[in-house]
Amino acid sequence: MNKLTLLHEGKAKKVWQTDDPDLIIQEFKDDATAFNNKKKGSIADKGVTNNAIASRLFTMLGENGIPTHFVSKLNDRDMLCKKLDILLIEVVTRNVAAGSLVRRYGFAEGTVLEKPIVELYLKNDDLDDPLMNEDHAVALGLGTYEEVAQLKDMAEKINSLLVPWFAERKLRLVDFKLEFGRHKGEILLGDEISPDTCRFWDAESGEKLDKDRFRLDLGGVEDAYSEVKRRVLEQ
């Protein structure tokens, strides 16, 4: 499968048209950003690491009935995917209080939530990806009430699969962001699942093993990503 036209370059990936109009190649970059592109940098081999992690996770989810855009891992940096009409809704699922949940509502960081919280955000960097509810999403023409409910249902099912899967690997899935899109009338999970889009804490030490190490200048970013990759791929 050949890369033809560059369709889009985002903060973490390039998207290429292929010989097949229904398929794209998602190329993972080493660029790192935080706070909606206000902080920029690079993480050595991040693209290689995230492609490996995301490919493994998409495969696992697909085997458990979650429809995804993943087709195959082509090489270290490239993933073959179904071409999606991206829904401009980011779905964040939270199992443990961290990040903006702590800042907005005053939770103590590390508080285990009695029930996972599913949040919707408008995918718009210019507006700093504001939090929204179902009514906002429908009013903005981003989807129907039924589609928004489907996104939340899918996020909850994905969470129910990921939490125990990561727990077996001594990783606590604190929270994570998902993106979805339409492909031939079906809503599929898109984008990636990686330390760029998830908060992972070591289940025993509580050490942060995700992009918070970059966001918060904690150091050891490459080692943290590599450790997640090692645990994801070892079983």
Curated annotation (Swiss-Prot):
Q: Which UniProt keywords are given for this protein, alphabetically ordered?
A: ATP-binding, Ligase, Nucleotide-binding, Purine biosynthesis
- Pathway the protein acts in: Purine metabolism; IMP biosynthesis via de novo pathway; 5-amino-1-(5-phospho-D-ribosyl)imidazole-4-carboxamide from 5-amino-1-(5-phospho-D-ribosyl)imidazole-4-carboxylate: step 1/2
- The protein, known as: Phosphoribosylaminoimidazole-succinocarboxamide synthase
Among the GO biological process terms of this entry, one is:
'de novo' IMP biosynthetic process
Q: Which InterPro entries does the UniProt entry name for this protein?
A: SAICAR_synt/ADE2_N (IPR028923), SAICAR_synt_PurC (IPR033934), SAICAR_synth (IPR001636), SAICAR_synthetase (IPR050089), SAICAR_synthetase_CS (IPR018236)
Instruction: Return the PANTHER family for the record.
Output: MULTIFUNCTIONAL PROTEIN ADE2, SI:DKEY-6E2.2
EC number, UniProt record: 6.3.2.6
Q: Which domain of life is it from?
A: Bacteria
